[in-house]
């Protein structure tokens, strides 16, 4: 009895220790959503924060150069300053994406797959159509309803001319 308790205690201790070790394996830093975030949107053209949060040494030097006259900056430097602040220009934001092709392709795949399933069901699952679907059967059924004078006021029998044996015009 004592041996089983010892093994049980050792087993529980080993499991709990390994769980604790695994739990502290990596630390995930969560994003603080109370701070403003960068977003490229046409309806929100000036985001609260810059696109690049941590500047490199060359970008810091360029930011210092920006404080002087802008006429001394080259076109490439102006573009690089713009890219520090914004990820995309309005032309790039307005550019159409090719996502619609993926959506249409996926929809067509599922429509085609559904068509294959329906064809398989018609061939292997469903039996032949009942005889009541034949045109001859429907004609006989209609003739019988006319002979019985079904619904003579507003229905089928009211539209049949019994003297001429044809539909009223």
From Swiss-Prot:
**Does this entry carry the keyword Transmembrane helix?**
yes
How this chain sits in the membrane, per its record, is: Single-pass membrane protein
Task: PTM Phosphoserine: list the residues.
Answer: 56, 58
All ranges on the Mitochondrial matrix side of the membrane: 23-98
Mitochondrial intermembrane face of the membrane:
125-169
Gene3D superfamilies for this protein: Cytochrome c oxidase subunit IV
Location of N6-acetyllysine modifications: 29, 53, 60, 67
Keywords, sorted A to Z? Acetylation, Disease variant, Membrane, Mitochondrion, Mitochondrion inner membrane, Phosphoprotein, Primary mitochondrial disease, Transit peptide, Transmembrane, Transmembrane helix
Q: Which disease is it linked to?
A: Mitochondrial complex IV deficiency, nuclear type 16: An autosomal recessive mitochondrial disorder with onset in infancy and variable manifestations. MC4DN16 features include feeding difficulties, poor overall growth, short stature, microcephaly, developmental regression, severe hypotonia, and seizures. Cerebral and cerebellar atrophy, and abnormal lesions in the basal ganglia can be observed on brain imaging. Patient tissues show decreased levels and activity of mitochondrial respiratory complex IV.
How does this polypeptide assemble, per the annotation?
Component of the cytochrome c oxidase (complex IV, CIV), a multisubunit enzyme composed of 14 subunits. The complex is composed of a catalytic core of 3 subunits MT-CO1, MT-CO2 and MT-CO3, encoded in the mitochondrial DNA, and 11 supernumerary subunits COX4I1 (or COX4I2), COX5A, COX5B, COX6A1 (or COX6A2), COX6B1 (or COX6B2), COX6C, COX7A2 (or COX7A1), COX7B, COX7C, COX8A and NDUFA4, which are encoded in the nuclear genome.
Q: What is this protein called?
A: Cytochrome c oxidase subunit 4 isoform 1, mitochondrial
Organism, scientific name: Homo sapiens
Q: What is the lineage of its organism?
A: Eukaryota, Metazoa, Chordata, Craniata, Vertebrata
